[in-house]
């Protein structure tokens, strides 16, 4: 069984906005094994980008546990955090051009991101770009590449130092369906070859199926997990509700709305299952 590469428990992140304290993450749990590809979904403001910034070493968590590839992100000094960002994690920002330097060629962009000697980083850069379908476009600048190839180049930059973990924020947002599928297919082969773990933030159902494991974040906590099984043409989804260490769960929003659940619910132990019911008017009345 693969080791746990990302281990977050009770993760809390609080920041100030206009003199108010905002709790962006409220005891979030997340466990990702080495070699996995996981999609993170959720509404705007749910905490997705905050989580990515913590895993990328950009922000330090306020409380809780966050360990990535043996690095304790809650106890890092600035020098260690800088080394972590450059050696252990690659981060693809939402806008692909934000990852690239416009005046450099495709090859130079990836070469610049490496930390190895000249001969080694030249070979690695060429290999990465070739595997990403850019082997014949090494001398072109980002502006001359179409959306799909810019994403491929940005992925090459993020993977340049051989990170254990690749983070990507909406990597297919700029692409049409066909182009996104082609990019993801090539990326899957490369991640498998490099044995790289990946976490993607997305609203794209295609990317969720590609990841085979999609985790929903709601109100700063992981709420549901969907696992996709079967062949690509006929995949089947199995959705589970995530329970934290205290036994707390978040019911899917669609269920709550359909049953008009508010404030209190009745739980019944029925053999090997628990049922959740709306109480009658008298039982549900507030004092």
In which residue ranges do the predicted regions lie?
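Catalytic Walker B motif of ABC-type/P-loop ATPase nucleotide-binding domains
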Residues: 166-169
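ABC ATPase NBD coupling module
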Residues: 20, 73-90
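Helix-to-loop junction immediately C-terminal to a conserved catalytic motif
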Residues: 56
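Conserved ABC transporter NBD signature motif
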Residues: 64-72
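ABC-type ATPase nucleotide-binding domains, specifically the catalytic core motifs of the NBD
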Residues: 16-18, 108-123, 131
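A short, proline-enriched helix->beta-strand linker immediately N-terminal to the Walker B motif
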Residues: 160-164
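Conserved ABC ATPase signature
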Residues: 141-145, 149
């Amino acid at each position: 069984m693969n080791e746990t590469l990302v281990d977050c428990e009770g993760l809390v992140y609080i920041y100030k906005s206009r003199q108010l304290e905002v709790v962006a993450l409220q005891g979030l749990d997340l466990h990702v094994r080495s070699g996995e590809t996981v999609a993170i979904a959720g509404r705007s403001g749910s905490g997705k980008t905050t989580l990515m910034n913590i895993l990328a070493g950009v922000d330090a968590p306020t409380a809780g546990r966050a360990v990535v590839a043996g690095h304790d992100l809650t106890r890092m000094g600035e020098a260690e955090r800088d080394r972590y960002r450059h050696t252990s994690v690659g981060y693809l920002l939402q806008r692909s051009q934000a990852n690239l330097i416009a005046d450099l060629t495709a090859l130079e962009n990836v070469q610049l991101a490496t930390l190895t000697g000249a001969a080694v980083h030249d070979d690695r850069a060429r290999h990465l770009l070739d595997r990403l379908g850019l082997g014949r476009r090494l001398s072109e600048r980002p502006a001359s590449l179409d959306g799909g190839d810019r994403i491929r180049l940005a992925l090459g930059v993020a993977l340049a130092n051989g990170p254990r973990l690749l983070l990507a924020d909406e990597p297919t947002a700029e692409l049409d369906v066909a182009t996104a599928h082609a990019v993801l297919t090539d990326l899957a082969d490369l991640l498998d070859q490099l044995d790289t773990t990946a976490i993607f933030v997305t609203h794209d159902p295609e990317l969720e199926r590609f990841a085979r494991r999609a985790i929903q974040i709601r109100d700063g906590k992981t709420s549901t997990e969907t696992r996709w099984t079967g062949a690509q043409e006929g995949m089947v989804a199995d959705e589970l509700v995530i329970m934290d260490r205290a036994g707390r769960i978040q019911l899917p929003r669609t269920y709550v709305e359909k049953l008009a659940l508010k404030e209190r619910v009745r739980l019944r132990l029925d053999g090997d299952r628990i049922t959740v019911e709306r109480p009658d008017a008298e039982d549900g009345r507030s004092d």
